[in-house]
């Protein structure tokens, strides 16, 4: 059973031409408990990234991830720590693998507990069950924007 989600403390605007919203999100999932977290939502024109979700290895459990995003899992031999600590789910394996450059893999290793959901030109950035204090909101937004820049192809940086 899932109760209706609650959105609070909404802040929105534009940064470097990218629309954003930051909000506290709470949802109750009977099997998994209550999740309260601060989420950054980014929307940038011109991007067309594949649909995928990434989170810590224990993030919501294998079955829910499979249900939401497909069964494919990804492992990167060059980054065994990343592969051990993160699950990526999505359908377009080759397109998703292309996104996970050395810089992207290093970013996730340096930001433990990070969860991201991407679809086309939208990105959600959060840590499960972590609410961010008001003084740390700008830092969270900057992290999300940094990751977005890493996902953008080098020849497409101007379309943000």
Q: Where are the regions that the model predicts?
A:
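Charged, low-complexity intrinsically disordered regions
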Residues: 1-39, 43-160
